[in-house]
Amino acid sequence: MAHKKGTGSTRNGRDSNSKRLGVKAYGGEKVTAGSILIRQRGTSFLPGINVGKGKDDTLFALKEGTVSFESIKRNLRNRKRVNVVI
């Protein structure tokens, strides 16, 4: 017989660090070349004029300018395109 009650264990207690995804530069903001505009998983936002796409789908400015967003219809799914206007 146990003198004290044994404590159970749980299979919880883990949580991943947040990945800080989302829009980093909004429409109308001035950005420099190389600035990160959007961090994303997949292509919710598509690269437009003067915008490049990294291997993790991050969008970044190729030239200095002002950020602008436009809505496009593609494959029955509304997407947004990000441009950097000089």
Curated annotation (Swiss-Prot):
PROSITE patterns according to UniProt: RIBOSOMAL_L27
InterPro entries referenced in this protein's UniProt entry, alphabetically: Ribosomal_bL27, Ribosomal_bL27_CS
SUPFAM superfamilies: Ribosomal L27 protein-like
GO BP term, example: translation
Swiss-Prot/TrEMBL keywords: Ribonucleoprotein, Ribosomal protein
Gene Ontology molecular function: any one: structural constituent of ribosome
One cellular component term from this protein's GO annotations in UniProt: cytosolic large ribosomal subunit
Disordered, as annotated region: 1-24
Annotated NCBIfam families: L27
Family statement: Belongs to the bacterial ribosomal protein bL27 family.
Protein name: Large ribosomal subunit protein bL27
Lineage of producing organism: Bacteria, Bacillati, Cyanobacteriota, Cyanophyceae, Synechococcales
